[in-house]
Amino acid sequence: MPNLILIRHGESQWNLENRFTGWVDIPLSPKGEQEAKQAGEKLKGYKFDKGYTSVLKRAIKTLDTILGIIGQTNLPLERDKALNERHYGALQGLNKADIGKKYGEEQLKIWRRSYDVPPPKDKTELNPDGISESLKDTAARTLPYFEARIMPDVLAGKNVIVAAHGNSLRSIVMKLDKLTKEQVLELNIPTGIPLLYVYDDKGNIKEHRYL
């Protein structure tokens, strides 16, 4: 029976500093590096056929660390921005507490946790293209890639590991667990903890749990 492992990258430096990160390419914090090592220890005994990550270094480093610990540094890998974190627009780089003070906690919650309301798209130094995404927008780019590239591997009987981000993984889990828009808003994916999905030979999920 094939396994699918989903893992959010270890804590990043901006997670630690409580800043909106999005597509800004921030490295892991020391704690995040340790979380990646702990994930590797938990995954000893698992053998993978393919790995997928976003193009952001915090996800790449997390997967590289895991593969080093489990002795699979030659695993075929595919990196794609479809698995990137949600783009937080003009909020990228800003402290969440400061945003709450400036715009109010309710507005902060809407930008962070609503399904279809994106943050402001104003151009900034960290958002030169004026981009911004809601969770709905993130799912619209993540899920087609997941269904076209990742699930065919799983359905072919391959064991797959995906290292990505809170919101791209929320999009995937929403589909796999058949969550409603309301349910996914309450879903929190912790950093650095492998989430296992076990499939049967017909492509049905037999079990899923955190390791």
Model-derived features: positions:
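Short beta-strand scaffold positions
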Residues: T53-S54, V162-A164
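Conserved C-terminal alpha-helical bundle
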Residues: R112-T138
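Glycine-rich phosphate-binding loop signature in dinucleotide/nucleotide-binding domains
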Residues: G45-K47, R149-K158
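Extreme N-terminal starter segment of soluble prokaryotic enzymes
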Residues: M1-I5
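Loop-to-helix element that buttresses phosphate recognition and phosphoryl-transfer chemistry
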Residues: E11-I69, P128-F146, L185-E186, P194
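Histidine-centered divalent metal-coordination motifs
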Residues: H9, H165
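Phosphate-coordination/substrate-recognition cap region in phosphate-metabolizing enzymes
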Residues: Q38-R112, D116-K121, M174-V198, K202
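GST superfamily/GST-like fold recognition
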Residues: G166-S171
